[in-house]
Amino acid sequence: MRRTESVHVPVSLLVSTEGSGIDRYSQELAKRLPVSTISTGRYQSIRQTISLARQFALLKQPVHLPNQHFGRWVPWLNHPSIVTVHDLVRLAFPFAKEGWISAMGLARDRTGIRKAAHVICVSEATKRDLMCYLDVPEEKITVIHNGVDHHVFNPRQKQDSSGSRSPYLLYVGSERPRKNLGMLLRAFALIKQQGHPFDSLALLKVGPAGRSDAFRKGTLDEAHRLGIKSDIQFVEQVSDQELAVIYSNAVALVFPSLYEGFGLPVVEAMACGCPVITSNVSSLPEIAGSAALLVDPHNSTALVEAIRCVVLDPTCRARLRVQGLLRARDFTWDRTAEATFALYQRVFAHLETEAAPSNG
């Protein structure tokens, strides 16, 4: 996509330099939109915070803050802002609350989101959460889905990038409680007990555990208790190119999360032709559509049956592959950028008009 033509009102975009899916959002927009950028990490030292505050104080144009954690900066700004909200996990999912520091940050985020001129939500589910938990009026919210880089995430030749020579189920994400990895481990243990052809099946887990070492310890302890520790492989960091190969080689992505603002691995897997099994809650039915097997994330029997379908039924696998590839076409960063650009024009140009002095 060519870079979008200049917007009527110059806009500054805060770009997070880290590597999560949320951080990628701002990086992909920066490639495609005619914005000036301010680079920062999601978590700042005191020195970085002071430097960022000074930059904001000098800004003479509207600002797009690309995730809800940056909403705390809205009161520092002298110009209108748009805040993107990716999820409200700390409000919607109680296990995500992490003490007084988190509570203080959440309070500041809430203040900023409410004071923003407009809010982007990455799914209708997140929009509903925003209206429910923060009482933000619907007319102040626009839903713009995330995208996927189809130049990277596309079907690849079968090869051994994962290091696993056995057929494998794939999970991509952290080991935080809301990700529901424990349920996947229990379902995997049950299906391994069914013998051939499941006895050769492995589980590949890609991504760091999360901010707490306790998450990985809990995963390993549960795997040991279930007797499947030797059947699980952990891969901490991979490049996007390597991840695309891993998706393409997997029997299926199994993503039984209890709460997602969007669920980027679902679309990445579909774009690579990987069958997807995911939850029927939160944003996941919205994002997956009819192109995945949707299961109750609290029901290990339902998860086992979905895995059996994908492993044993070639027709099921082929259908999920074809429908997933078609569904993934609906999510591109070009489309995300174009919708964001249109919102800049509507919100910021409208505000500029309101602020302009009348003649006479």
Describe the residue ranges of each PLM region.
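Carbohydrate transferase catalytic cores enriched for Leloir-type hexosyltransferases
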Residues: M1-G360
